[in-house]
């Protein structure tokens, strides 16, 4: 298939993820991406655009975001103010129509990639309010009495953190993929992209420690890929040797610069207790 997505030089994609992206493109369906925080959901859309050489548009959703904002907004307040000031711009209502992210993507002269990020942050009706526009690739502007149609159907990537369940009618129109947290082999590839000259011994010890922390039972917040990369950056900057990460020193229950990985005191104490018990039982 021409123009297949195969990942990029800075985004390691699994075979499953590549297949999902390419399937969504073939079907002309939005690609709904779920997964743990830090698994590259948001970055994916940008990398698809880079790989396929397409323009990129992004719409980051907040709890207050309404579907209409993605289409357009009519600035009635500015028009009223300009009318009172005798501004000639008021004669053309188009001067007060603010294009949204969907409109900008629909206007693209070549097929774009559109990211709708964290759709589950909005209210429960938000996905349903976009059904018609995403299905038909058009919407009506009441103020100007015109229909805006997409010049090219965008490649749409929608991310969700599972904060809310999405409506069935919306899900039926999507191709779904869950990004699993990277295993050691995939994580090694990811780290290599960011730190190509990292010594193998330090990489091995860092990954061993990282996954040991993630596997700690009862951990409130597991460290993510981005936090691992931050930690490795600090290890390199501080010239921390690999042997420090595997030290059996009873006074060093947690790894150096742990603040990049453990983000609350409960998790710090929990990990300290687990390491202490494991070392005591090993004697």
Regions found by a protein language model. Name each.
Residues 1-283:
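C-terminal regulatory/interaction module of P-loop NTP-utilizing enzymes
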């Amino acid at each position: 298939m021409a123009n297949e997505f195969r990942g990029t030089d800075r985004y390691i994609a699994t075979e499953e993820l590549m297949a999902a992206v390419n399937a969504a493109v073939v079907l002309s369906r939005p690609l709904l991406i779920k997964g743990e925080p830090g698994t590259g959901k948001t970055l994916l859309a940008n990398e698809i655009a880079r790989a396929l050489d397409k323009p990129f548009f992004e719409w980051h959703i907040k709890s207050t975001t309404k579907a209409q904002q993605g289409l357009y907004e009519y600035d009635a307040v500015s028009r009223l103010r300009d009318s009172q000031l005798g501004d000639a711009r008021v004669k053309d209502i188009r001067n007060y129509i603010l294009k949204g992210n969907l409109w900008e993507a629909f206007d693209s002269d070549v097929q774009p990639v559109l990211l709708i990020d964290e759709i589950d942050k909005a209210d429960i009706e938000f996905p349903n309010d976009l059904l018609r526009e995403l299905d038909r690739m058009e919407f009506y502007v009441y103020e100007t009495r015109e229909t805006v149609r997409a010049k090219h159907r965008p490649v749409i990537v929608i991310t969700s953190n599972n904060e809310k369940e999405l409506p069935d009618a919306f899900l039926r129109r999507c191709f779904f993929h869950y990004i699993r947290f990277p295993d050691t082999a995939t994580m090694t590839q990811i780290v290599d992209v960011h730190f190509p000259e990292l010594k193998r011994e330090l990489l091995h010890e860092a990954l061993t420690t990282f996954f040991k922390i993630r596997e700690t039972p009862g951990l409130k917040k597991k460290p993510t890929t981005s936090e691992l990369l931050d930690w490795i950056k600090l290890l390199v900057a501080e010239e921390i040797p690999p042997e420090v990460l595997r030290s059996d020193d009873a006074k060093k229950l947690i790894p150096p610069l742990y603040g990049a990985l453990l983000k609350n005191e409960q998790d710090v104490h929990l990990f300290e207790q687990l390491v202490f018990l494991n070392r005591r039982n090993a004697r």
